[in-house]
Amino acid sequence: MFVPASELRRQVKDDNDNMVLDAETAERIDAGYQVVDWAGLASHGFDKHGDYCFIYSYPPVRTLDSIRHDQMFDPSELEPRSDSLNVYLHIPYCSGICSYCYFAKVVDNGNSAVSKDEYIDLLIREISAKLERYGSDARIATVHFGGGTPSILEPHQIKKIMAFLHTLGNEDDMEVTFECAPETVHANLDKLLTLRDNGVNRVNLGVESLDDRVLKIMARRHGADMTRRSLDNIRDAGFTNVNVDLIYALPGQSVASWVATMREISRWQLESVSVYRLRRHPMKRISKLEQELYPSYEDGLRMQLAHGLVMADHGYLRVQSHKYAIKEQKIQQQTERKRGVSRTQLLSAGCGSYGFLNSTFYWNTKSLGEWGRRVRAGEHPTWLGRTLGRDDLMRKSFVLGVHTHTGIPRDEFAQKFGVDPLAVFGDEIGLAQRLGLFEVTDSAIRPTELGYFFGDELSVLFYSPQIRQQLDGLGMKYGMFFEQDRYA
């Protein structure tokens, strides 16, 4: 249940007064905070005020146009058809609506425009149609089931889609990630065994927080104890590659409560942990709360500093601006590929999914009803997109690559585009290097620890002048939010 602001204000004060950060951790966080020239960085655009959003694609969604429904199959010299594909499948059904979520989703109440059984049938039809146009001999390297809540599917639905995927050409070490919510697996070991027995080898659990009060504000349908039971079940099911998602800068959250969540999660020694700052979509319920209920801007920065310290204390490596792994081998391969220079082809299916085929970035319609009608009619359910030219493809390599521990490999970039990245983006790279955000070597251009901190702002540095101008006209910096949601 969503908490009214009047009640929340009282809860926040009472609970935060009773939670204190230990002195040593507070000193370490403050020491890290004091050494950064925040004002100097902000003067060059490196701050997190305004319409902050994690950058996961390029071009940004607010700059896209309508495209032909099959435009992603146009041949491209710079992005020729790959024999190694990544696949993303969107499952929009959820047990309820979180107060902050802006992804394509519907409540699984039996009244949606497309039933779950039909959705799986149509999803298979969409994948088949796309593979037929793209080239059915392409081998699948990675699969990610996202949502929504994929783990809301019934066992027979999981078996059906996984059986279909196994009929396709797959690489021997194909990575299959399945997103789960605690309320669907905390008391359902059989569902986890179904996932494992049908080829899923990586589980992503949406934990978000271990503070029950904060979870209530987020309108999550689980509590901390449910998360703990879920993690026990996931391990009992035999999964050896597990990631959890966490969110910070939430209303009602203090630095102390964030550190407590991070420490407990770290002690589980899961293979990887993803941490995201809250993205406050202006149309979501959580954005209607009074500003005083949120952590201060400075505390939001301290929370970001804190997750680096806590994860390092527990033996984790930072592998992306928002991801940590216990070993480098446990980095999610799909994320690494789609943020790289090569092997970036992403075939996506399902309502509200986005993909990149040949040189075209595309979004499927976010309306479940429209998606169903178009797939039934034999159409590709494309909504928005853009075919990228050479300049935008080079920029895409940086916009997405600046988040990763490998950065942008100079030889790989030069082999693809025929030029060293310094010759193209010398001014941008030079600025980031002078500000201490980039390390430039003979082999690669990589983010420093401070660069990781400003990964999204580094991405914006490589937006094209045309896109910057377009976003300026909209009063936006990142451009990652749609103007409105259409799910029905």
Which ranges hold each PLM region?
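Basic, amphipathic "hinge/linker" alpha-helix immediately C-terminal to the N-terminal HTH DNA-binding motif
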Residues: 445-452
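A short, conserved structural fragment
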Residues: 433-443
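Local cysteine-cluster metal-coordination motifs and their immediate loop/turn environment
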Residues: 89-105
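Flexible, acidic/Gly-rich N-terminal and inter-domain linker regions that tether
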Residues: 1-85, 481-486
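C-terminal scaffold of the Radical SAM
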Residues: 2-8, 12, 84, 105-133, ...
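Basic amphipathic alpha-helical segments that dock to polyanions
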Residues: 413, 428-435
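Short amphipathic alpha-helical interaction segments
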Residues: 419-431
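Short, amphipathic alpha-helical interaction segments positioned at domain boundaries
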Residues: 452-488
